[in-house]
Design a protein with these regions (language model features):
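Conserved catalytic core of the tyrosine transesterase superfamily
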Residues: 1-286
Length: 286
């Protein structure tokens, strides 16, 4: 429809037309934007091979609007309201409210990638030591994470019921068939809870949010805590990198970018040092 309404010459896919179509939407995920780039490149190559004129965007094409989406970091107030809504949810399946309450808190308090949570095995949780073995990671590298005492207590309560309800399932958070829920299931619930804490905001005006934002919120909270204690963030980053399972320190350094500028200045953080460390595209958008 876009091309039919904007192309005055039906026999040519012009550069202007292609670039206009590739303008990235304000809330468009980077993956979707990159997918559109790939699609239009292949289409243009096909048209050229068929004898038509078509502009082929460069392999390393970037657009002024292609900056990675900035995560939506819940404020302390919003975070409290969010988990209140999670805890108030009802369902025909009495197990689901407990699962959601535990799963979302585990992502937030441990900084897990949503897919790491979905792939967690029951056998990888040590309720005695309060540690979790993460095996199905983004870069296929195992790591161990320690839970807070409060998170450990909540998870123990959850597991007590889970082991009775789904003794045959290998997953920590199983669906009714004992398999893992799809990522869209968690995303739909996350957006629903977020909308509930924004009752005065029209649905079409709600910011784009996703479960992954809880992981970003965790990292931001850790950095805030270090700054409050007067810690040297640059020296502490390797610890956060290891805990969160980042492949390189640059991806961890990018979280400093999410902190308020006035907080960084007040804490004496040398921003230019971190800018040199950061990748052009943050790892979480991969």
């Amino acid at each position: 429809t876009f091309f039919l309404s904007n192309n005055s010459n039906e026999n040519e896919l012009t550069q202007e037309l292609v670039l206009n179509w590739l303008t990235r939407g304000e809330n468009e995920p980077l993956k979707r934007f990159n997918a559109r780039i790939g699609f239009i490149r292949k289409l243009a190559k096909y048209l050229n091979a068929a004898g038509y004129k078509a502009y082929v965007v460069p392999q390393n094409f970037s657009n002024p609007g292609s900056a990675p989406r900035r995560p939506y970091l819940l404020t302390d107030k919003e975070l409290g309201e969010f988990f209140h809504e999670v805890d108030m949810v009802t369902s025909d399946d009495p197990f689901i409210p407990l699962l959601l309450s535990t799963a979302f808190r585990l992502i937030y308090t441990c900084g897990l990638r949503p897919n790491e949570l979905r792939n967690l095995y029951r056998e990888n949780v040590d309720i005695i030591s309060g540690t979790i073995k993460i095996v199905n990671t983004k870069y296929h590298r195992e790591r161990f994470i320690a839970m807070s005492d409060d998170m450990k207590k909540l998870l123990v309560s959850y597991i007590t019921i889970r082991d009775v309800a789904y003794p045959e399932s290998k997953y920590l958070f199983p669906d009714k068939q004992g398999n893992m829920y799809p990522s869209s299931w968690y995303q739909d619930w996350y957006k629903k809870f977020f909308a509930l804490i924004k009752p005065d905001c029209p649905k079409e005006e709600l910011p784009y949010v996703r479960v992954y934002d809880l992981r970003h919120r965790f990292a931001s909270a850790v950095l805030h805590k270090w700054l409050d204690k007067g810690e040297n963030i640059q020296n502490k980053l390797p610890y956060l990198q290891s805990y969160m399972g980042h492949k390189n320190i640059a991806s961890t350094a990018y979280y400093v970018h999410l902190l308020p500028e006035n907080l960084l200045k007040a804490s004496g953080v040398e921003w230019e040092t971190f800018k040199k460390m950061m990748p052009e595209v943050p790892e979480w958008e991969d």
